[in-house]
Amino acid sequence: MQMRPELLLPEILVFLGGLVVLLGGSFLPRDRQWIARAAAALALLGAATAAALAMAGPAQSAFSGTFTVDTATGTARVITALTTLLVLGVASGEIAGSPRESDTYALLLLATTGVMVLAGSTDLLVLIVGFLLASIPLYGIVGLTGGRAGAEAAMKTYLMGALSGILLMLGVTVLYALAGGTDYALLQETLPAAPDADVGAGVLGVL
């Protein structure tokens, strides 16, 4: 089995950065939360750099072909990391010194990891993992606004996310039953021979 976890270095950097910010921020006083922001920015810059360097080489696959690193993946990784870095810069003025400042940065990094996984996935199961990792932290970010309005918004976001997740997994189940696998290449090869209505239902659920 071809694992090659080093190909996921940008995702690993962002994920570890999120964990460091989440755990380390709990021990930082409110007036030193900028350290968590700096750590998050460094993780994003490191991920963008690693993704840009990976684009210089040929297309490669990891984890038995379920994740592909190519120009499209690299471009999405760089854009995602730099966009999140921009969000950190814009949001820092609003949340600087707040009790949940480091938590917000950590959740943003975890959500960013999910988006980057989505960009490189070549298997529906990896797509599900990326979707969950990208969406679940958003519930916390919405809820961190506090108060009754924040709780209501977090609940609505959770319900919409849960519904989307159920439809996604239902669509994946249908496509797996039709194709006998979840690999994108296998789906492209076998689905043209499957009933159009069934394929449409599966694709609609995934989308």
Feature locations, PLM:
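Alpha-helical transmembrane segments of multi-pass membrane proteins predominantly involved
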Residues: 1-207
